[in-house]
Amino acid sequence: MARIAGVNIPNHQHTVIGLTAIFGIGTTRAHQICKTTGVAIDKKVKDLIDADLEKLRDEVGKFVTEGDLRREVTMSIKRLMDLGCYRGVRHRKDLPVRGQRTKTNARTRKGPRKSGVQLKK
């Protein structure tokens, strides 16, 4: 298995698909990386030579990926919550942030249904 940006890339996959295993690299960026490094898109990871892997490592290193990107996203959400803006409030309440309806849907974000309010006896 090839190791790029701290992630083990599966040997049986094509280079482009294998690069998408890295958090922060999707298919578009993976194609871009392969094009700039000159690595064949349809080549399997196990068939790459060390020089190709080194080129890929250098190119991937130019982007914010994995832990740094996760930290950046978390800090961005925390900043919204500290500001108290609408998006921050929605994050704090664990509700959909981008204007989706919540009266009937949004079960994934809200979690399982809570039982009705019980009256005191």
From Swiss-Prot:
Residues 100-121 have a biased composition (Basic residues). InterPro entries: Rbsml_uS13_C, Ribosomal_uS13, Ribosomal_uS13-like_H2TH, Ribosomal_uS13_bac-type, Ribosomal_uS13_CS. It comes from the Bacteria. The keyword tRNA-binding applies. Residues 94-121 are annotated as: Disordered. Belongs to the universal ribosomal protein uS13 family. Part of the 30S ribosomal subunit. Forms a loose heterodimer with protein S19. Forms two bridges to the 50S subunit in the 70S ribosome. Located at the top of the head of the 30S subunit, it contacts several helices of the 16S rRNA. In the 70S ribosome it contacts the 23S rRNA (bridge B1a) and protein L5 of the 50S subunit (bridge B1b), connecting the 2 subunits; these bridges are implicated in subunit movement. Contacts the tRNAs in the A and P-sites. This is Small ribosomal subunit protein uS13. The lineage of its organism: Bacteria, Pseudomonadati, Pseudomonadota, Betaproteobacteria, Burkholderiales. The gene is rpsM.
